[in-house]
A protein has these predicted regions:
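Extended, low-complexity, polar regulatory segments
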Residues: 1-33, 116, 371, 500
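Juxtamembrane membrane-interface segments at transmembrane-helix boundaries in membrane proteins
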Residues: 23-38, 66-87, 116-127, 157-188, ...
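Membrane-embedded alpha-helices of multi-pass membrane proteins, especially ion channels
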Residues: 46-75, 89-110, 134-156, 167-173, ...
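Ferredoxin-reductase
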Residues: 314-405, 467
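Membrane-interfacial segments at transmembrane helix termini in multi-pass membrane proteins
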Residues: 285-321, 329
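Classical protein tyrosine phosphatase
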Residues: 93, 125-149, 432-463, 568
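Reductase modules of NAD(P)H-dependent flavoproteins
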Residues: 242-275, 368, 374, 379-383, ...
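Membrane-interface recognition of transmembrane alpha-helix starts
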Residues: 22-64, 77-94, 126-143, 178-191, ...
């Protein structure tokens, strides 16, 4: 790997080039670590929904007359398998919706979307994980129940009415019933696929083997094909002539009589109705498509729209190599619109055609300047490969570089919680290292605005924690420009900047502008003191937005302070952006 200069940034400029077609795929997760009332409300709500669906389905199969003979063979395992199947179908459908990024961005941006809804949308990854968890729990119950069903089909063979049987004779090996039927084989494949997806989704494994996680996760179309075909074999039978053969009639049909309503304490054989024919059975119709059809269509429409928007490479206007292994890329894309706090998915075709990585916009396009920028922290195989490709251009002339630089494709933009910075009178932005990127877009927005008069935001606190002093140079010029702009407009109190250095070595602060130099403190910030100070200064502000982008430890600490420092008069609203 080539070395990155530690002093002055190195800039490479490229002229616009001809766009060409290129398909794309995406993968990203926006991670929310801390439990707040949004998490709890959704978890309680979704638990109630799943319990209700399970209970209603369980009772239906327990008491419905057309399942009497099937229920007589399988017992309670029939009800458990069908109840868990409904929960499984429900979550297989719901798990799609948090991944419809374009739809959620449009919905989040409407004026009708209240804060509670926006905060829920920002927790799309949490909702996705909750649905996956219920899906796995339902799968376990469903598998165990169907193993019991296979055993009961073998031991409780119905010799009177052979149509209702799955086994061909009494005592047939249950394993054979599972391994030689469409339902059994497709079920085994689905379980294996879900286990692989779940194991590779563990944060530790995903972090170190992201490509493997991505490949396996994108096998989900196979899962849904198996899910839709799972019941096509028609193993479970339901009675289709309940009107002419009422379960519980006195006709010798070889079964225990039961009235239509299925109450065991109300069975009276001597008063039961006589039947005029034997029971007839048809395969039980699948209900899976009723659950998943609409969510799949919504997801496909969202996916097609995103692919259409990201099929052309963007124009690379410039590349800047910053200290501390950070690369700044400036792009231009036709009709690209974004707002501060949003992020994009980036793909470099010379590195991988399938890997898309999330990066927060550090400067959004405007009417005067249609370009936008991102800052990439070189950490990992993909970012290292991108850096190597860009470094190669430093040894070529501009004409050659313009035609040989790697092509980049952009998907998005997508929403993040930092979009709400301007929706509060007072906002506190807390960043750890490269977590400054979403707030850089906010600062750039303030810098580029002609006037701040129409903004709701009146006070912005920026707390930036870094280990190296070089990190502050990423946005030192921009922060200084904003400060002088506010000073000229006679509103310097709008921006309050506090920088903290946590490294062990003695820092060299001489490279920083005087404005930032006066605001640097050594050591970790006393967050509780800062929160108390903000609450004391903002007595006229009831709601204060707190936005965090950094390590899990930092986010947890800030979340706890938002709860402990909130009073009846002043409430701190916690928001987190973190990309896994």
């Amino acid at each position: 790997m080539g070395s990155v200069p530690e002093a002055e940034p190195v800039t490479i400029s490229f002229r616009p080039r001809q766009l060409s077609k290129q398909p794309s795929l995406d993968v990203t997760c926006c991670r929310r670590r801390n439990w707040d009332y949004i998490h709890i409300v959704f978890l309680v709500f979704w638990s109630c929904v799943n319990i209700t669906v399970f209970y209603v389905t369980y009772q239906y199969y327990k008491h419905e007359a057309k399942f009497f003979y099937l229920r007589d063979m399988l017992g309670v395992s029939l009800c458990l398998s069908r109840g868990s199947a409904s929960v499984l179908n429900l979550n297989s459908a719901a798990i799609f919706l948090p991944m419809c990024r374009t739809l959620l961005v449009k919905f989040r941006g409407t004026k009708m979307t209240k804060r509670f809804i926006r905060r829920g949308i920002d927790r799309g990854h949490f909702i996705h994980v909750v649905c996956a968890s219920f899906l796995l729990m339902a799968t376990v119950v469903h598998v165990v129940a169907h193993i019991c069903n296979a055993i009961h089909f073998s031991t409780n063979f119905n010799e009177e009415f052979s149509e209702v049987n799955v086994a061909t004779f009494k005592g047939e090996n249950p394993c054979k019933l599972i391994l030689t039927t469409l339902a059994g084989v497709s079920g085994i494949l689905m379980v294996l696929l879900l286990v692989m997806i779940s194991l590779l989704s563990v944060p530790t494994i995903r972090k170190h083997s992201f490509q493997l996680f991505w490949y396996v996760h994108h096998c989900f179309p196979v899962y849904y094909l198996l899910l839709l075909s799972h019941s096509l074999g028609g193993l479970l039978k339901e009675q289709c002539n309940v009107q002419t053969h009422v379960p519980g009639c006195t006709m010798d049909v070889g079964a225990i009589p039961e009235p239509v309503w299925g109450k065991e304490d109300m069975i009276f054989t001597e008063n039961s109705t006589s039947c005029i024919e034997t029971p007839k059975f048809i395969p039980h119709r699948s209900e899976t498509w009723c659950y998943v059809l609409i969510p799949i269509l919504i997801y496909l429409a969202d996916k097609v729209w995103r692919n259409l928007q990201s099929r052309y490479p963007v124009i690379v206007q410039s590349v800047i190599f910053h200290p501390a292994d950070v690369v700044e890329l400036e792009f231009e894309k036709e009709k690209f619109k974004a707002s501060p706090g949003q992020y994009i998915l980036l793909m470099c075709d010379k590195v991988s055609h399938i890997e898309w990585h999330p990066f927060t916009l550090t400067r959004c396009p405007t009417k005067c300047n249609p370009t936008f920028t991102i800052h990439i922290r070189v950490k990992g195989d993909w970012t290292s490969a991108v850096k190597e490709l860009l470094l190669e251009q430093r040894h070529r002339n501009i004409e050659a570089a313009a035609t040989s630089i790697p092509r980049f494709f952009v998907d998005g933009p997508f929403g993040g919680s930092s979009q709400d910075v301007f929706k509060y009178n007072t906002s506190v932005c807390i960043a750890g290292g490269v977590g400054i990127t979403p707030f850089a877009a906010v600062l750039n927005e303030l810098r580029m605005r002609a006037s701040l008069g129409n903004l709701k935001l009146r006070s912005l606190y920026l707390i930036w924690i870094c280990r190296q002093v070089d990190c502050f140079q990423w946005f030192a010029e921009m922060i200084t420009d904003l400060y002088w702009k506010l000073w000229r407009e006679n509103c310097p109190d709008v921006l309050n900047v506090r920088l903290f250095l946590t490294g062990n070595s003695t820092p060299n602060l001489s490279t920083l502008p005087k404005f930032l130099l006066k605001r640097v403190s050594l050591g970790r910030p006393e967050m509780k003191t800062i929160f108390q100070e903000i609450a004391k200064c903002q007595t006229k502000c009831n709601n204060i937005g707190v936005f965090v982008c950094g390590s899990s430890k930092l986010s947890t600490r800030v979340y706890q302070l938002c709860r402990s420092c909130s009073t009846k008069d002043t409430k701190f609203f916690f928001n987190e952006d973190n990309f896994a």
